[in-house]
Amino acid sequence: PVTVNTSPTTSTNGTSVTSTTGDVAQYATSTAGLNYLSGAGLLNNCTETSSACQAKTMTREEAAAVVTVIGGISLDAPNAYSDDDQSIFQKAINGIPYYGIQVCIGSPFQFQPTETISRDQFACMLVKAITAGSTTNLSGAIDKYSDEGASKWTNEINVLAANDVIPACSSLQDKFCPSRKISI
């Protein structure tokens, strides 16, 4: 997983004290990971009630932004889709078909930026972005989940599992829940 060095700062009588708690794993699908991605501007802000925000799911445009950054994909591709012109993530979306990542969402002509994305589609996008971009490639694959066999992205899920990039979907460590949407 991506790690973030957490260093909380406290102030007493005008004196700042910083303590380091070490590197903390930040999965893209964990609450901490999603908060990190949101703070980095890679997710749309949620301005609704807290319960509505908790029920919000990751969109294709947000996934494009995340995988573009994670994979180190260039943001200078020409305009690829006509339905993303109003998206703040248009530059990230434009790179998707030039690196073959559009196969993960099965949408060759329209990107549909506000559609939600499933865990297996996101796994596919991550692997393809890392393979195509400037990030160090992932190696190996392990079949640690018992429920992803029907997904057409089983190989990509297994690569992410071998590299500890994406966690199980629940406290049952052998479940990936490939069709489940990623809630933010």
Q: PLM features: what roles do these ranges have?
A:
Residues 2-32, 39-61, 67-94, 98-120, ...:
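Feature responds to low-complexity, polar/acidic, surface-exposed segments characteristic
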